[in-house]
Amino acid sequence: MGQKINPNGFRLGVIHDWESKWYADKGYKETLNEDLRIRKFISKKLKDASVSTVEIERAANRINISIHTAKPGMVIGKGGSEVEALRKQLNALTDKQVHINIVEIKKPDLDAELVADSIARQLEARIAFRRAMRQATQRAMRAGAKGIKVQTSGRLNGADMARREWHTEGRVPLQTLRADIDYAWVNAFTTYGEIGVQVWINRGEILPTRKNKPASKPTKGGNR
């Protein structure tokens, strides 16, 4: 099962959290579509800012958006001008009060979304796919990854037949729920067609915290 399902969804509620946090008694479809519009708008607006994840929280008529990026300076702008302009645009898009929080990604080489996007951009620039995969795995291992797997599929190097190639280093245990596996799939649009890039990164194990039980008090009169 761990080999087929999305590793991020497989670990939801265990070691990974949801990217949208809200509850709706009614109007669920409209709220979900609004989340999709927000993410699409931010992805298009900040396509060169190395944005990995957009988390959305809702409370009453307020939307809190956390943008995880490896280039916070580009998102914020001089004196906060860029992020303020983005906030006003999202206010107009949603007709709600929007608050934006910028979260810096300290190690972009351990973020599957950013690694996959980097490989896809290299493929679009006609870089050899094996070289792009090898360099990505080497950077991830140097950054502290326990393992990484990169897969590309499509008409690689303009071949007539579509095929699949992958490069792996270290361990990537997909069925171990405590293993912090980050996964992403990005498409590269080349002159030969669309090439899919998938990345799995093992960032180590997250052990569940043990809750200490309070010591039981002795019963009145002692043991009998």
UniProtKB/Swiss-Prot annotation:
Question: Where does the record place the KH type-2 domain?
Answer: 38-106
Q: What are the protein's GO molecular function terms?
A: mRNA binding; rRNA binding; structural constituent of ribosome
State the Gene Ontology BP annotations. Answer: translation
Top-level taxon of the source organism: Bacteria
GO cellular component terms listed in the entry, alphabetical order: cytosolic small ribosomal subunit
Keyword annotations from UniProtKB, A to Z: Ribonucleoprotein, Ribosomal protein, RNA-binding, rRNA-binding
- Alphabetized Pfam families for the sequence: KH_2, Ribosomal_S3_C
The answer to whether keyword Ribosomal protein applies is yes
Kindly give the PANTHER family that the UniProt entry links to this protein.
30S/40S RIBOSOMAL PROTEIN S3, SMALL RIBOSOMAL SUBUNIT PROTEIN US3C
- Function, as annotated: Binds the lower part of the 30S subunit head. Binds mRNA in the 70S ribosome, positioning it for translation.
The entry assigns this protein to a family as follows:
Belongs to the universal ribosomal protein uS3 family.
Subunit record text: Part of the 30S ribosomal subunit. Forms a tight complex with proteins S10 and S14.
Name of this chain's protein:
Small ribosomal subunit protein uS3
